């Protein structure tokens, strides 16, 4: 299904003094400093997003980047690679949730530049503790369980940092799937504004 969807990516034609040039729609949006995080956050997806962030920084280190998020989450380490890059680069990263930002995707949403984190009205956010299948001999299970707890502590700290909630409150909320509407995510501090309509298109 996903391969079929990728085969349906539209192309746009641009006219210039040198003639016509065609772009797939995502490459065209990248020219306007727009990046999409779509679907599960895997190592491959994280690599692509990080590469685009670094490329846009090299093009203009002073101009904002817009990160549109519609994702159920994914691998914690992959998500943290994107998160760390967002915090590391010079341009401020504006985050916009459409559809959903769940699990690690919610960390990326909250990690946008202060005052520049948005959610569309019908979107939702979900936070929960990291999870993973642990198997093997007892010593390996213990090591993996400790790593899961370390990642949980790390994500709690990041949510607390960006939302203004206490770590105790975030820890309590993350014990189970914790769903928030766009307005609730705004009240919680994950986003700053529920975006209704903008006056001028960026593209």
From Swiss-Prot:
Enzyme Commission number: 3.4.21.92
Pfam family, one: CLP_protease
Described purpose of this protein according to its UniProt entry: Cleaves peptides in various proteins in a process that requires ATP hydrolysis. Has a chymotrypsin-like activity. Plays a major role in the degradation of misfolded proteins.
GO MF annotation list: ATP-dependent peptidase activity; ATPase binding; serine-type endopeptidase activity
Active site: 103 (nucleophile), 128
Subcellular location: Cytoplasm
Family: Belongs to the peptidase S14 family.
Major enzyme class: hydrolase
Gene that encodes it: clpP1
Keywords linked to the UniProt accession: Cytoplasm, Hydrolase, Protease, Serine protease
Subunit-structure text: Fourteen ClpP subunits assemble into 2 heptameric rings which stack back to back to give a disk-like structure with a central cavity, resembling the structure of eukaryotic proteasomes.
First-listed, main subcellular location of the protein, grouped into a coarse class: cytoplasm
Protein name per the record: ATP-dependent Clp protease proteolytic subunit 1
InterPro entries: ClpP (IPR001907), ClpP/crotonase-like_dom_sf (IPR029045), ClpP/TepA (IPR023562), ClpP_His_AS (IPR033135), ClpP_Ser_AS (IPR018215)
Catalytic function, reaction form: Hydrolysis of proteins to small peptides in the presence of ATP and magnesium. alpha-casein is the usual test substrate. In the absence of ATP, only oligopeptides shorter than five residues are hydrolyzed (such as succinyl-Leu-Tyr-|-NHMec, and Leu-Tyr-Leu-|-Tyr-Trp, in which cleavage of the -Tyr-|-Leu- and -Tyr-|-Trp bonds also occurs)
GO cellular component: cytoplasm; endopeptidase Clp complex
Disulphide-bridged cysteine pairs: none
Domain of life: Bacteria
Any one GO biological process: protein quality control for misfolded or incompletely synthesized proteins
Organism: Treponema pallidum (strain Nichols)
